[in-house]
């Protein structure tokens, strides 16, 4: 199987055509995702960067879905290299324009993507529905999928919670100073090895996030492309340093043209957990967002990640719809 979609592969299912997507289709895919969830606009430049920075060792196939030669959505499947996976999990994703979200067309999309994924070696399909998308959840449950786990998403009102956040930040700054931990943005760090250190620490943190599909280590050459994303800047990416070690990071994603501000990634080294480092980092990111005039920020975490969920509650976050993961046995 190719790691990206073979341009010669065109699929047809149930009156729909699936043509291989190119980077130039990323903006359309972002538009479709925005139409599906208007409260969560997706940024076209961000999607193009996402598509352009795929790990070359993974299998990634993306298609534009057409009905009567008219684009109505996109669909994809991907998976890590099988020699790095104990079980052959593969993810299936899609978005259709709201008027095109019918049971029949959804069945055609999943038939096509499941067939491609299975041919690539996937034996457990993973699909996702937002917590308030009852139609999609019902469809998945009726077609052999079962609910596996849920994430929790949160919104923080920076206007209503500003005083509380400022007080918490002052307390955390004092605590970090007393502990000898420096909190600063990446651009101010002069260590020539800082990006490699952030990579190693992030890999350690990602490995410990509760999940069903195991985290697969990312090569530094792939990881470092994150810093070129249009949603992040080095002067808005906060790190924690203890001596020579970088022991934590927290980053907000700022879409350049449209979309909400979300936590992109927060992680800490095992050796500093329980010492308030994640709290200090997250508080600096939202303090900076306040200074930039942002009024709300959002975050999402696995529903079993108790420490970070507790921190979200302390900071004043309120729940919004998260995502539900569904799995389907494809060994038959």
Q: Residue spans of the language-model regions?
A:
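Acyl-donor-binding surface of acyltransferase catalytic domains
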Residues: 1-11, 98-190, 324-328
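Short amphipathic alpha-helix that is part of the acyltransferase structural core
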Residues: 2-51, 58, 64, 171-217
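Conserved donor-binding loop and adjoining core beta-sheet/short helix segment
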Residues: 22-26, 33-131, 241-269
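Short loop/turn motifs at secondary-structure junctions and domain boundaries
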Residues: 53-57, 228-233
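Conserved acetyl-CoA-binding loop-helix of GNAT-fold acetyltransferases
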Residues: 102-115, 268, 274-287, 310, ...
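Hydrophobic residues within well-ordered alpha-helices
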Residues: 139-140, 263, 311-312
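Active-site/acyl-donor-binding loops of N-acyltransferases
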Residues: 143-165, 236, 287-332
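Extended hydrophobic/aromatic segments used for targeting, binding, or gating
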Residues: 247-266, 273-281, 286-288, 292-298
